Design a protein with these regions (language model features):
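Residues lining hydrophobic/aromatic ligand-binding pockets adjacent to catalytic sites
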Residues: 1-176
Length: 176
């Protein structure tokens, strides 16, 4: 389907025609995952809608995974608290963090994504992963501060999907 072929392409700010953009509505329970699945399956076969359905199930999986391991969330919150204090006392960390949050790193794609997120509350799903990778591996910033930046700005910011996706980028959510 068109969704399966094109969902991974970020066409730029405001040009998200290949993704559903339903996540903010699901987060606020305006619609439920079940509602979305029923609607999709009423219009498409399971084979046609398979990849879209997979993405809905990932959200549910992450929610259940984190709920059954609440210590992961508690540690993340403690880390953010500690790192927020470090931002006050470590000027190098603070400067890199501020540049990243303001979209002033000099990395064009990253800066555009930071500004899009701050201005619109949305970022394409793959841009989120690329952003996280640059945040951690290029800018050398703690993943927890990046996850916090996302949660503070994303209209669809979901504690489980966000935290566990950032953990996945840094290799903490995958065994091996």
């Amino acid at each position: 389907t068109s969704y399966t072929r094109n969902r991974n392409f970020d066409l730029g700010a405001g040009q998200h025609k290949h993704v559903s953009q339903l996540s903010a509505y699901i987060k606020r329970r305006i619609i439920t995952e079940e509602d979305v699945l029923k609607r999709v399956l009423s219009a498409h076969s399971l084979n046609e809608a398979g990849k879209f359905i997979d993405e809905i199930f990932w959200r549910t999986y992450f929610k259940g995974w984190l709920e059954s391991r609440s210590q992961i969330w508690m540690q993340y919150c403690a880390d953010v608290h500690h790192l927020t204090h470090e931002l006050q006392t470590q000027s190098g960390l603070r400067d890199r963090w501020a540049a990243a949050c303001l979209g002033e790193t000099g990395i064009d794609c990253f800066d555009a994504w930071a500004k899009e997120l701050a201005e619109t509350g949305y970022l394409h799903n793959h841009a989120r992963m690329w952003f996280a990778s640059i945040w951690v591996y290029t800018l050398q910033l703690p993943w927890q501060l990046g996850a916090d930046f996302f949660l503070r700005h994303l209209l669809d910011g979901d504690a489980a999907s966000n935290t566990l996706s950032w953990r996945w980028v840094v290799g903490l959510h995958s065994v091996g």
